[in-house]
Amino acid sequence: MAKKRIYEVAKEVGVDNKVVVQKAKELGFDVKNHMSSIDDAQVAKLKGSFQNSAPAEKNNKIKISVSSIRKNEKKQEDNAGSKKPRRRNNKRLQNNDRNHKNRNDRDHSANSGSGKPKAAALLQQFKQKQRAEEGQLNRQAQKAKKEYHEQLKYPKKEQPVNNKKKTNKESNNKKSEEVEKKVIGPKILKPSPARLKKNQPSTNEKPAVKVSIPEPPKEEKRNNGRGKNMGKPGHKGKNQFFNNHSEQSDRSERKRRKNKNKKRKQEQKPKKQITKRKERPLPETLVYEKGMNAQDIGKLIHREPAEIVKKLFMLGVMTNQNRSLDKDTIELLAAEYGINAKQKVHEDISDIDTLYNKRMEASKKSKNQVKRPPVVTIMGHVDHGKTTLLDRLRHTHVSAHEAGGITQKIGAYQVRLDDRLITFLDTPGHAAFSNMRARGAEITDIVVLVVAADDGVMPQTVEAIDHAKSANVPIIVAINKMDKPGANPQHVTEELMKYNLIPEDYGGDTIFVNISARTGQNVDDLLQMILLQADMMELKANPTEMAIGTVIEARLSRGRGPVADVLIQQGTLNIGDPIVVGDTFGRVRTMTNDRGRQVKKATPSEPVEITGLNDVPESADKLVEFKDEKTARSVGEARAQQALQKSRENVQHVTLDNLFDTMKKENMKEVDIVLKADVQGSVEALQQSLEKIEVEGVRVNIIHSGVGAINESDVTLAGASNAFIIGFNVRPTATAKSQAETEGVDIRLYSIIYKAIDDVTAAMKGMLEPTYEEKVIGNLTVRETWKVSKVGTIAGSFVDKGLVKSDAKIRIIRDGIVKYDGEIASLKRFKDDVKEVKQGNDCGLTIKDYNDIKVGDEFEVYEMQQVEPK
């Protein structure tokens, strides 16, 4: 039931708060002040009492009587000029001043300066006898009228001050309306001390209390000077006390009204509505994880943790907000809320192979796919012209600088034909590089099978066909060396038809092109066929996703750290992206394309060389980009830990089942080898080739393998294990070489893989009878280079150790890696040709068929000396 306060009821009936409080107490209501509350029934009863006791007619009669008082007042003022004030009136005025002094500020404000105790008594009597008869009210009005006239004739001394203040109040219409409302109520029975201004028209609409007091008439001013300065600010004597008292009363009155209006505005001001928190709806399914607590579940179902704890308590589960909940409790809680519960399945982010496949499948279904360049792998038997064909396409001379004239690592290049790009992968053709060819077939779109027209189908040719078919990759046959006299393309075609490679002329679907990589014959036709096959395949990729790719080769570079050649297959790889490559991780620091230029991003089908990994990855490892480095680091460390655990599990312990096999192996002789190579692919190929060597009673044991130059730790390990070191396209450091000579560790250096395999095989069979031994006779450092036409690059060098002979062989070493092995073309000191230059001297030399010499390169001069077999 709604309740109202006393001041609200007083405002509605237009009566003072104290009157309403008094009336409520008379009716038996339990109220104390104007802030007390009463119910609706009491409000109706209280309002009814005021309506019965003070009908509208009485107010109207009172208003009319006041109006008549004002009219009579004007007539009396017109006739007051000829009359003189009586002396007894002065005595009465003094009595009124005393009464006014004893009256409190509240009565002074309500009576507007009236000091008649009789008027106050009449007003109090009128309030207490509201149910009196109408005649009694009229008599009270007559008495009030009489007192009013007496007050006009004998004004108080402090009235001029009040007159000034009242005149200022007249300018405020809003305050005048408040005074008018007071006149209409019961309080108008009090006589007002104000005097009407002379010649100011009086209206029935304005109550008498609103009219300002006029100046005394001229006749009154001429009355022997009495009352001339009464009530003025400069008047001295007793009236000065009344003036100060009147001003103080006015200030307190204004302050009281100001506080009352402020309080009324605060009551009328609407209260701020407290916005209730909207409850979010429950989800249809709760996807939870094992070990979640009440706080975690509350965030998922949009409920407070305290509510969840209470709900669990009602279900008989005692817990708190931070205690982990089991699977059954979470499902029971979800059923209580009426929602389904489903446990979240965590994906193993360390399994980047699965992540790679998922991203590859998602990219194929994406709507943001665009055309990408085709990836073409050139495969075939060794020395059939694969690298020469690529040199013709790129206008380079890669094959001229390869050791033994054969490719021993995968190379990735891009060729532009008109406005289109083609990515080529050059794979080794030697039998030892079978895994490299298999990796090349897995990441390619098209395989170009190069077969020599004068040699026909060879074992590695058949192996390349098998790799391409197992990878489900289309094959384009390029019959090379058509410029040779013994070329027989028809014989080659017949041999390939045995392996289900039928040319289109014979009703098959395999494209055959007769070319000559040396002369460039039909090379453009081969490129056109590659683009035609790519258009039929509709090769597309999504460059907007995170990058994925495959490692082609990896190596350790001095000054740059681990370096990986990768092929981007989907997405775009940018500098600074966090990646995981195999068991390694890092952030892309630099990217270099096949032309040796720095690039900021790599798009699909683009091969790049990247740095920034924490270790050298394996060839064919998958590259996966992650959102942040923290995730990439955690995945990489987890994969490295798994690889370490797996390697420990491979260690076999002696049991009763394998005791005989273990004793048999212990009786076998082992050839312990420390293997170092320039790239990771060469390490794998050489290691697998050496482990496949079968000699009865002897087996190969690779105790360590890695990429980079041979260092002191490799020599220390070989000395402790009684092993020898095989270096493939790498050289030992100066410290490692000196340590090996001191400890008697044998270091064998090779640049052609089958020579290393033959030497190890001969050593295992005990038939190794070295006829020649390589002996280094001097070391040089390049300090300056000059390029001379028709001569080539002249290397100005300083002999650091030993001597240099003009007929010796020379090896170029850059960053610990062998760049070229050849012969000295010319040797000069100053401008004279010399046969040798000794240690501590400068010299100039040129190298036969090689001009890529840079400042800082190291030259190793050696001779092949014949030694007696041991």
Curated annotation (Swiss-Prot):
It comes from the Bacteria. Residues 426-429 are annotated as: G3. Gene3D superfamilies: 1.10.10.2480, P-loop containing nucleotide triphosphate hydrolases, Translation factors, Translation initiation factor IF- 2, domain 3. Residues 380-387 are annotated as: G1. It is found in: Cytoplasm. Residues 405-409 are annotated as: G2. Transmembrane segments: none annotated. Residues 371-540 form the tr-type G domain. Residues 49-284 are annotated as: Disordered. The keyword Nucleotide-binding applies. Keywords: Cytoplasm, GTP-binding, Initiation factor, Nucleotide-binding, Protein biosynthesis. Residues 516-518 are annotated as: G5. Coiled coil: none annotated. GTP binds at residues 380-387, 426-430, 480-483. Residues 480-483 are annotated as: G4. GO terms for cellular component: cytosol. GO terms for molecular function: GTP binding; GTPase activity; translation initiation factor activity. Residues 116-127 have a biased composition (Low complexity). Residues 70-81, 94-109, 144-159, 168-183 have a biased composition (Basic and acidic residues). Residues 254-279 have a biased composition (Basic residues). It holds the Pfam family IF2_N. NCBIfam families: IF-2, small_GTP. Belongs to the TRAFAC class translation factor GTPase superfamily. Classic translation factor GTPase family. IF-2 subfamily. One of the essential components for the initiation of protein synthesis. Protects formylmethionyl-tRNA from spontaneous hydrolysis and promotes its binding to the 30S ribosomal subunits. Also involved in the hydrolysis of GTP during the formation of the 70S ribosomal complex. This is Translation initiation factor IF-2. It comes from Lactobacillus helveticus (strain DPC 4571). The lineage of its organism: Bacteria, Bacillati, Bacillota, Bacilli, Lactobacillales.
